[in-house]
Curated annotation (Swiss-Prot):
Family matches, as PROSITE patterns: 1433_1, 1433_2
A Gene Ontology term for the protein's cellular component: cytoplasm
GO BP term, example: signal transduction
Gene: TFT7
Pfam families: 14-3-3 (PF00244)
Name listed for the protein in its UniProt record: 14-3-3 protein 7
């Protein structure tokens, strides 16, 4: 099994360098299905692979939605119909990718996790992928995805608060994405600002304890938290006139 595991990690690294992310994901799924605790590197390879696979489709969906709005405002009904059909194709792909990683997390990654750090990592991921579903789903499906996302982020936060330092990049990344969830999915800028500010302030207070190896990662996420706070605060002051679509929130 060790030889097979080593081979799949190598193939995943190779696929990443070749920017063949679908294959990167397949290699890492093979390791996840061995039901072993992943190393930090393996965990990151899973995350990077899926982030790229989903990221391309999320970008496509946003572009199509924007074009659809423009065509709608011009009254081009035929074009709007065409875009809707095309957008549905992208949504089907998004749904499939999210379902795939969510089942890997639930069936293999979380059950094999033995540390607080990896537990936070996987629950954060779970929150992220339910959030991506909530971005484009409607009605009950959106409500369900939002609720599942909230549950996963809350579970991650509970473990992060007890097991990880406020300056830990995974805890900071969780706060960043959880606050984006409040802002974009639950339309709650006040809650988003509170969460982001609390995470930022707690990290600042313990900056001395920042380890050298995570210094770059932690300070980068802190910068993103601050950027979002600036954007969201001005949004609140302007009474929500800030267009969320024009400027994407920083995410981890």
């Amino acid at each position: 099994m060790e030889k097979e595991r080593e081979k799949q990690v190598y193939l995943a690294r190779l696929a990443e360098q070749a920017e063949r992310y679908d294959e990167m994901v397949e290699a890492m799924k093979a390791i996840a299905k061995m039901d072993v605790e992943l190393t930090v590197e393996e965990r990151n390879l899973v995350s990077v692979g899926y982030k790229n696979v989903i990221g391309a489709r999320r970008a496509s969906w946003r572009i199509l939605s924007s074009i659809e709005q423009k065509e709608e405002s011009k009254g081009h009904e035929q074009n709007v119909k065409r875009i809707k059909t095309y957008r549905q194709r992208v949504e089907d792909e998004l749904t499939k990718i999210c379902s795939d990683i969510l089942s890997v997390i639930d069936e293999h990654l979380v059950p094999s996790s033995t540390t607080g750090e990896s537990t936070v990592f996987y629950y954060k991921m779970k929150g992220d992928y339910y959030r991506y579903l909530a971005e484009f789903k409607a009605g009950d499906d959106r409500k369900e995805a939002s609720e599942q996302s909230l549950k996963a982020y809350e579970a991650a936060t509970a473990t992060a608060s007890s097991d990880l330092a406020p300056t830990h990049p995974i805890r900071l990344g969780l706060a960043l994405n959880f606050s984006v969830f409040y802002y974009e999915i639950l339309n709650s800028p006040e809650r988003a600002c509170h969460l982001a500010k609390q995470a930022f302030d707690e990290a600042i207070a313990e900056l001395d304890s920042l380890s050298e190896e995570s210094y770059k990662d932690s300070t980068l996420i802190m910068q993103l938290l601050r950027d979002n706070l600036t954007l969201w605060t001005s949004d609140l002051e302007e009474g929500g006139e800030h267009s969320k679509g024009d400027e994407r929130q920083g995410e981890n």
